[in-house]
Amino acid sequence: MHMKSIFILVSFLYFSFNANATQMGNVKGKRTVSLNNSVGTSIAKFFSNSPLEKFEGNSQSLQGTFTLNADQLEQSSGQIAFPVTSMKSGLSKRDDHMYGKDWLDAKAFPMISFDVKKFSGITIKKSDNSSVEFSATAEGTCTLKGSSKPTKAKIYVKYVFESENTKKRASGDLVMVDADFSVSLKDFNVLGKGDIIGTKVGENIDLDIKLFGNTN
């Protein structure tokens, strides 16, 4: 076979493969991911940093699903939520204040949620026969204390294809997500009492959310 013919054949095979591949390799279409403790314990950690006091806490009562659109990752979506009263800071008295009307008002607004509308700035970090990893910005709406505000979160997604090893944890493909973002308490009408916000409680609360799930 002449070199020119070989070049044409290789080029044809290359472009044929890539025409069928997506940003997630051979994964195609929409994949719905449900949180599953068998894969790992999903957790939302929150951090308050102020001049007089620093503290952190977490919720391990996350719920929700999200859909990864392998054909167009930008069009992925979903919702993650957790009860206000599941947030624990290590001090029960502080937690009781946090749940109160001046703060998160858990009685009137029992849930905190993040609705993902799309991904942007997607960068594929790894893609092979076992998994795909990518970073992106998840854009959507955070709802807290009855107020909904546009929010962006930096995310890192690891998508592991089903294998005999993964089946030992859960069926389907396994998905792990690490998300980081910050919320301004004032933006969500969380005012506290007196001048506590800005002195003993940070004006902005940082969140680090880790999600573990599997495809249906």
Regions found by a protein language model. Name each.
Residues 1-3:
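N-terminal secretory signal peptides that target proteins for export/translocation
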Residues 6-15:
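Sec-dependent N-terminal signal peptides
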Residues 21-216:
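Low-complexity, acidic/polar, glycine-enriched regions of mature
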